[in-house]
Structure formats: C-alpha cells, structure tokens
Design a protein with these regions (language model features):
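N-terminal beta-strand-loop-alpha-helix module at the start
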Residues: 2-77
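Short beta-strand segments
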Residues: 23-25, 49, 113-115, 144-145, ...
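Class I SAM-dependent methyltransferase SAM-binding "motif I" and its flanking Rossmann-like core
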Residues: 132-161
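SAM-dependent methyltransferases
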Residues: 1-19, 204-221
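Structural motif
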Residues: 20-22, 43-44, 63-64, 82-83, ...
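Short acidic/polar capping segments at secondary-structure boundaries
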Residues: 28-29, 52, 71, 116-117, ...
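Long, charged alpha-helical interface segments
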Residues: 153-221
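Acidic/Gly/His-enriched mid-domain segments of enzyme catalytic cores or analogous surface patches
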Residues: 41, 50-136
Length: 221
C-alpha cells in the first residue's frame, strides 16, 4: 500500500525513490537518465493501455496496465490478464484512468513519463491534466520528459534549481504572480508563451500566485 498523506508543493529533488507510483503513457518512450531512473526504482509501475506492451518488450514488469484495452493485441491481453484492469468508460483518457487506479490505492506522489511526444494534441492534453490531478485528485504530480519536468502548482511553490536553469511558467488562473530567484520577474501572463524561457539565478526559485499555474524546469545539460 502506498503512502496516504498529501504532500506539500515544495519539490526539493527528483530522487528516484520520491514517488509512490510511476505512470507510463503511450508517447515517446524515455531516453534521458532522469525518467529512466525513476522508472527503474518505481514502487508501483502502471502502464496506460498499449504502453504496457512497450514496457514488457523493453524488459520492465508493470504492476498494472490500465485503460480501455483497445490498443493491445489479443495475445498480449491473454498473456497478461492478471495485471490488466479494463476501464471502458470514455469520459476520461487512459492517463486519468491510470491516475485514479493509483489514487484508489493510496498513492499521492505520482511521476508521469512517456506523456509527451508523438501526437501533439495528446501532449497538450496530458500536460494540462496535471492541474486537474492536483486540484481534483489531490495528487502531487510531476511529468518527466527527456528535456525537463512539468510541475503543477498553486499559491506558493519552492523549487530547487541551479544557476542558469531554464524555467517557464504557464499561467492558468492567476490574476497575480510574483517570485524570487528568476532573471525576469514573473507576472500574471495572459498568454502561454509569455512565461516561457525565464532563467534561475541560483539554487532555488520561489513563486507566489493567487491561482493555478504549471512550471517547466529544464534539466542540466
């Protein structure tokens, strides 16, 4: 059983052991060492539908495969029937079905990998779902890509950074945003592009907003 508490919005590290569960979606399979390390150390490794086949093909052993099962071969479904959880309702996508599967088992700190790449509409939808998971499902979520991490946030958020780290802020509902530790002072951006390509000055960035926003922090090259 995973941990029960809802963690505070202060992301001190991307330590591979920091998560209750890792959800693998059907986008580009990770190649960067950060998401790969998180997957290797996952306490619960949950695949979204066809991502289960990809995981098994690459030698991983998923805890569960969740979705409507419309993208898996009949042979694979038969061979892995004991870990497949079919959810047929169409109100939510497979990423959300997998998230609910994890939260119903007490998981709150969830890392998402393979959620970007391939179809751009899926990428945008998956990133935006981070805010929904944070607000409605009380998940402390991070979405790890091969280039950086997306962090859903609200109110005050502290992030450990390094000097020169590229930081982008996507305002969702704030009428006020300010912060410390960035080269350019953030504000309540009215368009998504306005908050991109900021830069951390040192070892931490603190953001304060009166609503919800998503932060992107690039990895160190």
């Amino acid at each position: 059983m995973c941990n029960q508490p809802h963690f505070s919005k202060s992301f001190a590290s991307l330590h591979p052991d920091a998560f209750d569960a890792v959800i693998v979606a059907g986008g580009d399979f990770p190649t960067h060492h950060v998401p790969l390390a998180v997957m290797e150390r996952a306490r619960m490794l949950v695949a979204c539908d066809s991502a289960g086949e990809e995981l098994v093909r690459r030698g991983y052993k998923p805890t569960a495969i969740v979705g409507d099962c419309d993208s898996m071969s009949a042979e694979f479904r038969a061979a892995h029937a004991d870990i497949i959880y079919k959810v047929e309702e169409q109100d939510y996508n497979d990423l959300t079905k997998a998230t609910r599967f994890c939260t119903e088992r007490g998981c709150r700190r969830i890392a998402y990998v393979g959620a970007t790449g391939k179809r751009e509409d899926h990428t945008l939808g998956n990133i935006s779902l981070l805010d929904f998971y944070s607000r409605e499902l009380y998940v402390d979520a991070l979405m790890l890509t091969d280039y950086g991490v997306f962090i859903p946030a609200a109110g005050e958020t502290a992030i450990r950074t390094f000097a020169g780290q590229q930081i982008s802020i996507f305002n969702l509902s704030c009428t006020r945003i300010d912060g410390d530790g960035l080269r350019w002072q953030p504000y309540a951006f009215s368009a998504l592009w306005q908050g991109t390509l900021n830069e951390a000055l040192g070892e931490s960035v603190t953001l304060r907003g009166d609503g919800n926003y998503i932060v992107y922090a690039a990895y160190k090259l």
